[in-house]
Amino acid sequence: MLNKLFLISAVVLVTGLSACAQKQDKKVVMQSQGTEQIIPKKKMNWNPLTPEEERVIVNKGTEYPGTGKYEHTTDKGTYTCKRCNAALYRSESKFDARCGWPAFDDEIKGAVKRIPDADGSRTEIVCANCGAHLGHVFLGEGFTNKDTRHCVNSISMNFVPDKK
């Protein structure tokens, strides 16, 4: 009788533990300030990030002003998402806003998603493909004719120069 009880307990324990260890096989839910974004796992074949890149791209941090490698870049080319390589901005839309970060007055169509911050004071911009934090967008400042400034962390992007 004691052996039967022990055997039944062991089976229940092993079954329960193996059920807890099963992985989610289809989708992962990313949460960001009250919103949920469901991303199929097949799209999660992203580039590895350094701890500092992860602090900005995943945890929505900000690099220190004036420290980004693309702030003063004037070469012709395309700025891509550091995490998934999606094209985000063309160099023709980049301008010097003297704000300490690269500034663009337009994105590649459909490449950037705008998400109002929880307090409504700013609008976050993220990669439309993978949800990577890029920075913030500001309207009505008068820097360019488009009256839009995408203030982007250099650390969130790579630069691919045009072929000469």
Residues covered by each model-derived region:
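Bacterial N-terminal signal peptides that target proteins for export
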Residues: 1-7
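Repetitive helical segments and hydrophobic/amphipathic motifs
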Residues: 12-13
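C-terminal motif of bacterial Sec signal peptides marking the signal peptidase cleavage site
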Residues: 16-19
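Sec-dependent signal peptide cleavage junction
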Residues: 21-41
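A short Gly-Trp-Pro
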Residues: 37-80, 86-164
